[in-house]
Amino acid sequence: MGECTGITFIDSTRIPVCENKRQSRNRVFKGYAQKGKSTMGWYYGFKLHLLCNERGELLNFALTRANVDDRSPKIFNDLTKDLFGKLYADKGYISQSLFASLFDRGVYIVTGIRTNMKNRLMDVHDKIMLRKRSIIETINDMLKNVAQIVHTRHRSISNFIVNLLAGIAAYAFYDTKHSINMEFEREEKQGVKQLTLF
């Protein structure tokens, strides 16, 4: 696992264990997996929560049932216990109580705003970093498609856990990880000053 640098990204991804129409017949994960909903629709399985820094190194992870909320205090406190600095998240992590508890520990959570929320001023650096959240989405994609942590051929719960841990360990040993170049440059084009992140 990597170490916290003060810039952290968080996200969760779905891990289905079988097709929806087969969930009542699934005996391997009975009592473990649950039905949950993501942006892709309903599924039966688990949810993998990931934290990474701007260098693409995984900081922490947690596996929960699919019906557990991303903002669950127990899960979120365990995931973020060693963090400092800023935590960039999507709109699914908007919660006043979550913001307050993290702020008391010295972590500032930065999220986008929903359409039904009042506009608020955001630092230019934070706005640019929110657009760089694709780094954690890329990690999710690599874990699913390259390390193949998602498939429906598991024959036991221990096989599932070993496959998941092996995929995460394999990602930690990848030579090239996606990262963000944190150099800022002020460029002036036609009299307009602009801040650029490489």
Residue spans of the language-model regions?
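Short alpha-helical elements
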Residues: 1-198
